[in-house]
Amino acid sequence: MKPEISDDLSRRIFLRGAMGVSLFATSGCEKIEDFLGMEPQEGPVVPPSGEGVDLVSHVLNRLTFGPDPSEYARVKGLGVDDESAVAFFLEEQLSPNEIEDKRTQRAVRRLEAIHAPLGELYEYKEDHLLEQLTRATLIRATRSKRQLFEVMVHFWSDHFNIDISKKECRWLKVADDREVVRKHAMGNFSALLKASALSPAMLWYLDGRENRKSGESEKPNENYARELLELHTLGVGGGYTQKDVMEVARCLSGWTVRGKDRFFKGKVEFHADAHDDGAKVVLGNEIASGGGRKDLDDILEIVGMHPSTARFLGRKLCIRFISDDPSEASIKKVAGTFLSSNGNIKETLRAVFATQEFLQGSRAQKLKRPFEFIVSALRGVRARVSSEMDVVDYLIRMGHAPFQYPTPDGYPDIASPWTGTLLWRWHFAIALARNEVSENIKVEEEVLIEKAGGVDGLAASLLGRNPSIEEKAAIERSGEPLALLMASPGFQWK
């Protein structure tokens, strides 16, 4: 059962209606729709205070796609107190290859298309590839025990965004997800950056394959060079000029993607005769003439470990894990670790999680993006899911379908762009609680309440804190505690 809703909903409804005003303010109502049907109120975006959210719930909300009751209990038992338990959990998640995850791997292994070698991807219809890649993404986010790894896969997928609908990306993005993002998500940034630069999908998406020099008067295609500096490394205001963009484009000329050979279609090749082999100067660094394919390595070394790159990535990681407006102290600490560790992603993450702002000052201050909201709901209520694709319609309506963001900057990671998703979040919460999403997704509300020791326990499990007196009263009046809790402000923020 899929609810109907207008496509032209105001993008301001969500934060005005759900965040600025408590959903629990309505009185005298008996139906859940009455609680959620109030008029949106004007006012600033105000997240919950985060007061009462315990450390384990906070860490699980940030490092995973939302806690499920069994995982919360497991993590609580890892130490003599919450601090030691969280420390153990952090180290556990920073070593994903040591975490047994056979159940998830078996489920993903059945999706044969996403495991196909590069040249064989063209044997599949593009819609089939998108479906299998999306299904694998949802399975991993929902079921995997390697949760931080999956969160970082999403982070890098946005950082090195590729819209799967663009030309050959419809086939090649599958290989990019497998060989670039997932392979290097918790490794070294320099290796990730080079893998992305030589990704067939990226060469198609940002026109790198068209960057060639065939005559003295021909200018290089600068599309990828510009995004490399602006989005992948230094960032806006990172100290580069238009001249640097052109020089980087010259360094990267000559790389292309084979298109005709059946078995090698999609293979990346370097054509020396299409490369600008003259001397270049990038960010004050001289690159000698005659470098050929080595020019790519030289330029990536210059920009990959640049102080501006460290700050740009440090800020993005702090935004992802701490708040939409992280402190300068946190950014500097993370950027410093990035440089001192030579781009080691695990060490950089340790620096993020060691900041006092992460540990103490940011609880319930990050709005869940639609993908995070839906997956956290499925995990939080331990839904039995036999077809993850049945939630994709909701993701499309909320504007957060995987691999379908049209511009290179990737899906935004702050609250304000997601202001138009309130009604669809409500629809999903109600449908999930009532077992109306689809016949392939089932929730047992009474069992959840019983295992939680009552409705208050269920509320504590989903909100990460004990419910307030007002919340308890509203839940009792609604008659549908699970739907109300998942639609409440406390469940929208993490």
Describe each PLM feature range.
Residues 169-382:
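Active-site substrate-binding loop specific to GH73 endo-beta-N-acetylglucosaminidase modules
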Residues 69-159, 163-174, 180:
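N-terminal accessory alpha/beta regions
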Residues 36-47, 130-140, 176-177, 227, ...:
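Short amphipathic alpha-helical segments and their helix-coil junctions
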